[in-house]
Amino acid sequence: MANERNQQNLTSLRGSLTGVETFYVVDYQGLTAGQLSQLRKNIREKGGQLIVAKNTLINLALQESGRDFSDALKGPSALVLAQEDPAGVAKALSDAAKGNDKGIPAIKGGFVEGNRVDVRVVERLASLGSKQSLQGELVGVLSAHLSNFVGILEAYRDKLGGGAAEAQG
């Protein structure tokens, strides 16, 4: 572990994990170089990052930040960081797994907003949709309620204004 390359990789991993509240551990074995490259691109578009490193280095970096994933780091593993859109990154992983007959990448577990989660939680998160689509839905719901509220206020204003106009006439 003491070789210089491992030390550099560990330092890089530590830096990448700084401030990250959501990440996923995935099995990527069986993906072709082209599929892995496409997966990296899709994850990057969602504001995430896919890191392939030795399990020992990933485990050390995670343990130093108080997160133990030694049980999930068996076999070829990659760390997928989700800085901006955790649901979007989870969906990119899910879509990639559905896009091939092997179901790869296979999610082994994750850490979402400070809590360790299992595969089922990550799959549910992936089904939510991206942050942008959820924000769009929220804006739609809020604007509908605000429109109704404005309609009520206008009706009440007309009722009050109509009574005052009749008294003056």
Swiss-Prot record:
Give a GO cellular-component term.
large ribosomal subunit
> Any stretches that span the bilayer, and where are they?
none
The UniProt GO MF terms for this protein read: large ribosomal subunit rRNA binding; structural constituent of ribosome
Keywords in alphabetical order, please. Answer: Ribonucleoprotein, Ribosomal protein, RNA-binding, rRNA-binding
GO BP of this protein: translation
The entry's function note states: Forms part of the ribosomal stalk, playing a central role in the interaction of the ribosome with GTP-bound translation factors.
Q: What is this protein called?
A: Large ribosomal subunit protein uL10
- Organism this protein belongs to: Deinococcus geothermalis (strain DSM 11300 / CIP 105573 / AG-3a)
Provide the gene name from the record.
rplJ
